[in-house]
């Protein structure tokens, strides 16, 4: 079973632990989410809890969004996401709120976000290729290089100029350093995908017990 919450990336800072260790953390605003819909295996083919985060003015939302929010007795939301096979309580129902207290300090989580978009970029910036000689006699400066000996064909996976960033990425096994229930904030060790003020999804780690299980097997 999975527990999760939606949030907004605020930025990065650093905190000291009780041992005096300086830890870089990402601050994530997890203002209580509203349960917009509860999906069941019988009605929808899978079980999930749909959460809504960050209020949006009704002027900026269409009629279906307003009607969907009205069923949960709340305002339209900017960010809506699903938590599959959610473990948020047996009596969870539409209109309930999910807050930061579902997590505890020391837990590991997986954070999913959208990376920064860089637009159309060349190979040097996008893929980290080396440039050619910059002398006047050189005809190769910042080109992608040879496409191979076969004419009229580009091999699959060839690194060429194109769009960079703006992809959905998940960083796994990040530790929660602090849970601030009063301010609805999570402090997560390390960095997470996306720019400041971008939306993220936080779920309990799928690999939380991998190292422990492997160590037990090796000891046997």
From Swiss-Prot:
GO terms for cellular component: cytosolic large ribosomal subunit. Residues 113-143 are annotated as: Disordered. This is Large ribosomal subunit protein uL3. One of the primary rRNA binding proteins, it binds directly near the 3'-end of the 23S rRNA, where it nucleates assembly of the 50S subunit. Part of the 50S ribosomal subunit. Forms a cluster with proteins L14 and L19. Keywords: Ribonucleoprotein, Ribosomal protein, RNA-binding, rRNA-binding. Disulfide bonds: none annotated. InterPro entries: Ribosomal_uL3, Ribosomal_uL3_bac/org-type, Transl_B-barrel_sf. Pfam families: Ribosomal_L3 (PF00297). One of its GO terms (biological process) is translation. NCBIfam families: L3_bact. One of its GO terms (molecular function) is rRNA binding. It comes from the Bacteria. Belongs to the universal ribosomal protein uL3 family.
